[in-house]
Every structure is written in structure tokens, then in C-alpha cells.
Amino acid sequence: MFDNKKFNLKSKFEGFDYQIQTLISAKNLEYAAIFHEQGLGKTKIAIDLGLEWIKENIVDSVIIVVKKGLIKNWEDEIKIHSFIKARVLNNDIVNNHEVFCSPARFILMHYQVAIKEKDRLELFLQSRKVGIILDESQVIKTPDSTLSNTFHDLSDYFTRKLILTGTPIANRPYDIWSQIYFLDKGKSLGESYLEFKNNTDLTNDLHENDLGRDTFIDSLSKINK
């Protein structure tokens, strides 16, 4: 949509081998999940992946959704690892109008902005090719929340999708369902949250059900395929 020649889309620094391998594995996928533990540089991988999407004209822009308190951290990380200046969607309607109308390549916003700006986001996503990266994606683990439903509703409009978290499952295996549903709309873990929950609830016999455990593990293995 916009001339990429005006932007330096190179990464400032080469990643570690495992970061490069993760990037190679994910860059041609319509959706992917990175569940690396904290401290392994998921942010670097995500920024480099966004640059690759833009460089290859797969997307025009990348929206990165983070917890509200991490906006500044991500702005700094984008400056460190790329030559792109991120624009920020926030609670200011005028500011957001300017961002939506700009040729911004990286756009940051915190999760709650999606609820307030859902209608304009939907229009924006129909006007250009957009990739999305959800940082700390466990934020949308509750499938019947307004926040999770907002992202589920917008999901199909994104050209590329990536979720990042070091804790996709805290104490409950079914916490992962909503996050993966955002990516593939039920292809891997099914379209019914209640059915998935009943099959993976640790209060049932999953711990001693070999077939149930194997089915759960097999479902997770399909996420990036």
C-alpha cells in the first residue's frame, strides 16, 4: 500500500541461532505461537518477524498488542532492534485517527484499546494488509470475556498472526484454548471451549488417561502446521 523504499526495514542486530531458526520457521506461516520462556528474546524475534512480513510485502503494517505498562518498553525495544519508529494507539480518539491514516509500519497498542476502537480497527483492517502480534497472549485466555471476544471477532481480518507468551498455561490446560482459537478459529483445539475444557480439566481423569493426554499433546502439535 505504501512505498517501502522510504523505510529502512533491516534489523539492526543479528539474533542468536535459536532466534534465527524460530524466525525462519514462522515467517511463512499464516499464524504461529512462540512459547519461549522469559529471557529468551521473544521480543527480538517478534520485531524481526514483523520486519520480514513488511519487507516481503506480506503485510503493510504490524499491530503489536501489549499490556498497558509495557508500551514504553516495546517502543524502546523497537528502537533498539530496528530503524522504524512505532506509532501508538491509545485512549485519544484524535491521535488514533492520525495513526490509522498514517503509513505507520509498526503500531503499538495496549489490549483494552481494542475494545474501544473495535469498529475503527475493523475498517482499518479492511483498508490494508495487517499482521498482529499479541504479547503476553494469556491476557485473552478467558474465552467469554469482552476482551477475548473482541480479538476473536477481529481475527479473520489479519493477514498474519503471532502470539507470544512464556506462560500459555498456568495451572489449567484449557487456558490455552482462547489463545489458539484467536490464531486458527478452532482448527487445532476445536470450536467448543466447553468440550475442550471438559477433555483437559485436571480435575477429571486426564492425569491417568493415556489416550486423553496423547490427544491433548497431538492437538498442541498441530498449532504451527
Where do the PLM segments sit?
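Substrate-gripping "pore-loop 1 plus following alpha2 helix"
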Residues: F124-Q126, V139-H152
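Conserved pre-motif I regulatory segment
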Residues: F2-F35
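Short hydrophobic/aromatic beta-strand immediately N-terminal to the Walker A/P-loop
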Residues: A33-E37, I63, L162
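Walker B catalytic acidic pair
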Residues: D135-E136
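Conserved nucleic-acid-binding Ia/Ib motif block in the N-terminal RecA-like helicase ATPase lobe
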Residues: V65, G69-F106
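Walker A/P-loop
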Residues: L29-L49
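Conserved P-loop NTPase motor "coupling/switch" region that bridges the ATPase
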Residues: V59-S61, D76, I80-F83, S102-P103, ...
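Conserved helix/coil segment N-terminal to the catalytic DExD/H
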Residues: I93-R128, T142
